[in-house]
Amino acid sequence: MAAESALQVVEKLQARLAANPDPKKLLKYLKKLSTLPITVDILAETGVGKTVNSLRKHEHVGSFARDLVAQWKKLVPVERNAEPDEQDFEKSNSRKRPRDALQKEEEMEGDYQETWKATGSRSYSPDHRQKKHRKLSELERPHKVSHGHERRDERKRCHRMSPTYSSDPESSDYGHVQSPPSCTSPHQMYVDHYRSLEEDQEPIVSHQKPGKGHSNAFQDRLGASQERHLGEPHGKGVVSQNKEHKSSHKDKRPVDAKSDEKASVVSREKSHKALSKEENRRPPSGDNAREKPPSSGVKKEKDREGSSLKKKCLPPSEAASDNHLKKPKHRDPEKAKLDKSKQGLDSFDTGKGAGDLLPKVKEKGSNNLKTPEGKVKTNLDRKSLGSLPKVEETDMEDEFEQPTMSFESYLSYDQPRKKKKKIVKTSATALGDKGLKKNDSKSTGKNLDSVQKLPKVNKTKSEKPAGADLAKLRKVPDVLPVLPDLPLPAIQANYRPLPSLELISSFQPKRKAFSSPQEEEEAGFTGRRMNSKMQVYSGSKCAYLPKMMTLHQQCIRVLKNNIDSIFEVGGVPYSVLEPVLERCTPDQLYRIEEYNHVLIEETDQLWKVHCHRDFKEERPEEYESWREMYLRLQDAREQRLRVLTKNIQFAHANKPKGRQAKMAFVNSVAKPPRDVRRRQEKFGTGGAAVPEKIKIKPAPYPMGSSHASASSISFNPSPEEPAYDGPSTSSAHLAPVVSSTVSYDPRKPTVKKIAPMMAKTIKAFKNRFSRR
């Protein structure tokens, strides 16, 4: 009756909360709700939680509504929220498992969940609601909360441990077949945990005994299957499973329940370690023979070849990963045994279960063979090369072609120089590689024979080019010409001989002769690079004299470079100075002749050259030399130029002056522009330049009287425009301009003017970076 009356009161208060917006009334109703004995069933039937939760953002009542909702949330048991999480976790694990194992585990899980729901639902049935509601809520809440928390911790640990297996690079390819070992048997871990909990809580909750019996039976089956599984000689997989068992037991079992199982765990560890040590000592072929049951002779041979290839050629890390991949095989027989033990068929052999799993084993073996196939080949090649004798090492190293050109030459599409020796050796290696590939397709016994035969082939083929090279070296010194024994003079201490022209010409690359017009067209096409690099002019490359010059040649060379320094030459004949005088201009030649009158009779031919160059149409008069003709025509030309300059100057002087230059604001203050005036007013820089006024009188021009009078008229202030003495009408802070030069503020640093091209470049850069 009390529950029904509380339900009615809650419904009334809920209706009032929805209808009345007054904050005082709302607070009153919420306080009444907080005093009522509200249960989970009332919250589910009325939905008052949603109504109160809608007021959580209210200005006046929001905080009280939030507190009330938080108080009601504590009433809801954690078990209901934990079960869907557990189901999600089971789904995520079941994706990684094989389908047959998944069905078996779902059956077990369904049986277990039914018993759990049956026991758990009694406390919420309507018969027990009125009688045992208070007692059961007090007893069950701590048990369920702790149980839910511990199950969450289990899942977290599972998820923490699973990435270590999934991150393994070798086992990631087999993700569909293999599941993380730490989460392989969640029922086993859950049942162990649940049994230990129930042993502690037996006097408190009495109706959980059916679940306990079920879990004990299930645990016994699991223990039997594990003991059978221990007898099989799977060393590394069992040891790894045992380590996982150990870590899961350490994390999940409470301290009180550990004492019985510690001894069994330690004994199992010791037995597994002994087994693994014995198997490591045994040869690999025996291990493989035990693991794989006999199906047929051909399959045996193939499997042995694959295993021997793996163990010989793969590095130890890959071998370990292959052993690690065998864990699904151990897990599948275990699940098969669990299923059979349920049905009561104890006479079922383990060998038959392993025989059913043969197709899976074959698939995994083929996958293993596919993935390291490239590594096997490369390792075989390395072994064949390493097994060659040390005497042949230098020849074998030459087989791999070193880069013959620089990186720059590869970029410019230069053709590499071919070497006959290397071509022969590469053919030998190609034959060897073909032999290796053929032998790889056959059995491993033939593989090893081919590896042993390879050195002999390489020996015979490398000896032949070596003998040919020796014969070539013997022939080369016979071709060289024998130099005659000539007595050489003693070498001077300060003498440095220069290279001859013949030697320089031999170093220069000769241009390729084109055999056909098509090649000429291709060479002319700029998009294609020829054998030689593109030549770009970068100054004269010959920085030294091509050959040794005589003393006369050196003197003439110095005189040619310093003609303006030649004055009197004394008794030097014209024949010696002729090459120097040929380089002279008419003015230089005339000056040298003035100092040396003896040369005038000899230089007529030089003057003839100057006359033909400067005065092409003119001819010498009767009995007139070429020198006299040039001087006459040159004087006439200069006279004409002087007359022209006088005429032009006179014409410009008599022209009326349309525009006259006047000095503005000589004795007054110049008005600055508006923007300058505003800045002066703003910063107070107007009257700081010159405090007192100075009247400046313009200096008269030093030209004629007419110009002086005109200038004096122009510069004197007219009576219409009196001199401005007072300050400007616009501003009292304006400074008088002293001279025509612009006055600048000494506080500001002088800015260096940027060149126009540089300014343009800087502007382009700014525009470019401002867009980003």
UniProtKB/Swiss-Prot annotation:
Residues 566-610 form the F-box domain. One of its GO terms (biological process) is transcription elongation by RNA polymerase II. Residues 522-681 are annotated as: Activation domain. Gene3D superfamilies: 6.10.250.3180, Conserved domain common to transcription factors TFIIS, elongin A, CRSP70. The keyword Transcription regulation applies. Keywords: Acetylation, Nucleus, Phosphoprotein, Transcription, Transcription regulation. Residues 705-714 have a biased composition (Low complexity). It is found in: Nucleus. Its main location: nucleus. GO terms for cellular component: elongin complex; extracellular space; nucleoplasm; site of DNA damage. It holds the Pfam family Elongin_A. Residues 79-105, 136-156, 226-235, 253-269, 275-308, 321-343, 372-384, 434-443 have a biased composition (Basic and acidic residues). The modification N6-acetyllysine is found at K434. Residues 550-559 are annotated as: BC-box. SUPFAM superfamilies: Conserved domain common to transcription factors TFIIS, elongin A, CRSP70. The keyword Repeat does not apply. Residues 4-79 form the TFIIS N-terminal domain. It comes from the Eukaryota. SIII, also known as elongin, is a general transcription elongation factor that increases the RNA polymerase II transcription elongation past template-encoded arresting sites. Subunit A is transcriptionally active and its transcription activity is strongly enhanced by binding to the dimeric complex of the SIII regulatory subunits B and C (elongin BC complex). As part of a multisubunit complex composed of elongin BC complex (ELOB and ELOC), elongin A/ELOA, RBX1 and CUL5; polyubiquitinates monoubiquitinated POLR2A. PANTHER family: ELONGIN-A (PTHR15141:SF75), TRANSCRIPTION ELONGATION FACTOR B POLYPEPTIDE 3 (PTHR15141). Heterotrimer of an A (ELOA, ELOA2 or ELOA3P), ELOB and ELOC subunit. Part of a multisubunit ubiquitin ligase complex consisting of elongin BC complex (ELOB and ELOC), elongin A/ELOA, RBX1 and CUL5. Interacts with ERCC6; the interaction is induced by DNA damaging agents or inhibitors of RNA polymerase II elongation. Interacts (via BC-box) with CUL5. The BC-box, which mediates binding to the elongin BC complex, has the consensus sequence [APST]-L-x(3)-C-x(3)-[AILV]. This is Elongin-A. The lineage of its organism: Eukaryota, Metazoa, Chordata, Craniata, Vertebrata. The gene is ELOA.
